[in-house]
């Protein structure tokens, strides 16, 4: 008998096939493997900086936001701006179940229990709170997702074992830490550097040699190696500018940017990558949705957030015209064909209110839309070059080639 969780998985498979394969006549083995991997939990934490997003979007109490959810961290952080409505969407049923669990926890738990659940994310008390408080509040597909798992390991137990070590990205980070130790490098030592100068010096002295090694160059020259970063074959080529032999150098530059773009006591992305945890002693070095000062506001605004398992194009297609103020695409367009990007922007334009803004990241530097949109569409959207480049320089996640802010000029 098929469970509701199985239905969510089947929907993930169908949505991901459409996203990865698009209109390709021939599906490669790389595409098939990536689509299979991406049906699982990929991002226990989202890897776009919400602080940058909020500065770009300038949300207010009348804003309707449409965003790709991923792990839900940023959709929750946007609530701090008290917009009228946030419509979150994701292809992956695991991400949808994670967002629904977070929503329920914000509604039902006090701050201490909420932070233990999603900040520390490594306590048996989390399982108790799930069973006694949250379980009865969740819908059936979400219950079934967290109660099931491989070989009898219930997924909810990830929050006892250390949630941020799971997911494709969490496992990859763990593998990188293991590999670094083989070179005699403890990546956690970045966390004790006192300023950005020391962080850069430490990286150059201890970490650069790993990226420069022949074995790393060999491994990173294969697209399969980056699937655990959630990077599909098309985005892999954009990341290395079509030259796989240069991928190790590209990854070194991005890793150094992550390690040095901000002081380590102000960059929770670097803490997760190099320390595999959050900085529990420093509230200011946490995602906004995990900070105590924002918790009551989150509780008050949580009903403004909805989450749906769907394609963002279909969500926009079903929205009324002139109804959306902000669209956050993450790096989704790196996956898309030219026709798919054009279709997406037709719907974005149809639903856009006056002054609407769209933000997204790209693996490479160039924007994918400038050469794709028809003159009619292109004339309605203007890239804010100065602000885009400025905000990219501040983005603490440090892994993307560019940040793009487009503003509606109707």
Segments the model singles out, each with a brief description of its role:
Residues 60-63, 310-326:
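A short acidic, Gly/Pro-enriched loop at the edge of an enzyme's catalytic core
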Residues 386-410:
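Core SAM-dependent methyltransferase catalytic element
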Residues 61-70, 86-87:
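Conserved class I S-adenosyl-L-methionine
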Residues 2-22, 94-296:
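Class I S-adenosyl-L-methionine-dependent methyltransferase module
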Residues 41-64, 341:
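Conserved alpha-helix/loop element of class I SAM-dependent methyltransferases that forms part
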Residues 341-354:
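A short glycine-rich, Lys/Arg-flanked "PGG" loop and its adjoining helix->strand segment in the class I
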Residues 328, 354-367:
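Conserved beta-strand signature within the Rossmann-like core of class I S-adenosyl-L-methionine
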Residues 88-93:
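Conserved acidic E/D residue at the C-terminus of a beta-strand in Rossmann-like folds
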